[in-house]
């Protein structure tokens, strides 16, 4: 299966994904989640002056002081971001220790039965969507979400270089909400490396990122959830 290259974000598609009272529409997300980006070091865009940059294609890393259980020690891929309309993304470091065959009511295609499932976020948890990650030396990491079982099955069947996984739920922000949270230092931004494709490393991804940011973040990351245990 050939994965087409799409846009990093589009306000019409974000609006479509939030239509019908905020219910999840995978057909809209598939238009949003196609992004190409190259690896680089930790960065923080200037959200105070000038046009606000799109954060699509970035890893959104929860600050160690983040206490919201939905995002505590979470790493998300931002698949779409428009400052006027909001953002969409999925958590990539929370495997459910389940496979597709464990969650679907009908027998899935054989190639997908053992595909690992991740908790993608607190919204739309009754939906299962597939994603294909592919690292390209010249372009960086490419992510495609596929709606149907057949499309994802074809990608596996054709021995695509892409890594296939599935997500339950996603994360969403309204216009200006993510920017406000970033100004409050709730999130750190980082661009990913090929290690994102190593699924067995993803559960430790947040800790790995904290260690890479230096002694201060490493110390904060090591603090227990219960302050009385310090």
Model features per residue range: what roles?
Residues 3, 13-14, 30:
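Short terminal hydrophobic/aromatic SLiMs and anchors at protein ends
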Residues 4, 23, 27, 40-41:
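Serine residues within intrinsically disordered or low-complexity segments
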Residues 37, 42-230:
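A short aromatic-anchored loop/beta-hairpin motif
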């Amino acid at each position: 299966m050939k994965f087409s290259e799409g846009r990093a974000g589009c306000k019409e598609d974000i609006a479509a994904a939030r239509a019908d009272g905020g219910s999840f529409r995978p057909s809209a997300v598939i238009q949003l989640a196609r992004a190409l980006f190259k690896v680089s070091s930790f960065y923080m865009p200037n959200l105070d002056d000038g046009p606000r940059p799109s954060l699509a294609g970035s890893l959104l890393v929860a600050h160690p002081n983040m206490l919201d259980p939905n995002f505590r020690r979470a790493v998300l891929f931002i698949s779409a971001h428009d400052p006027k309309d909001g953002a969409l993304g999925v958590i990539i470091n929370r495997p459910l220790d389940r496979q597709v065959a464990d969650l679907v009511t009908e027998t899935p295609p054989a190639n997908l039965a053992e595909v690992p499932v991740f908790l993608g976020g607190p919204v739309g948890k009754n939906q299962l969507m597939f994603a294909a990650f592919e690292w390209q030396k010249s372009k960086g990491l490419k992510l495609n979400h596929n709606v149907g079982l057949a499309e994802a099955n074809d990608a596996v069947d054709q021995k695509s270089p892409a890594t296939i996984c599935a997500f339950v739920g996603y994360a969403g922000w309204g216009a200006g909400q993510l920017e406000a949270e970033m100004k409050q230092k709730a999130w750190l931004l980082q661009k990913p490396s090929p290690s994102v494709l190593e699924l067995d490393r993803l559960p430790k991804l947040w800790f790995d990122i904290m260690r890479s940011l230096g002694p201060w973040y490493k110390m904060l990351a090591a603090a227990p959830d219960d302050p009385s245990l310090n």
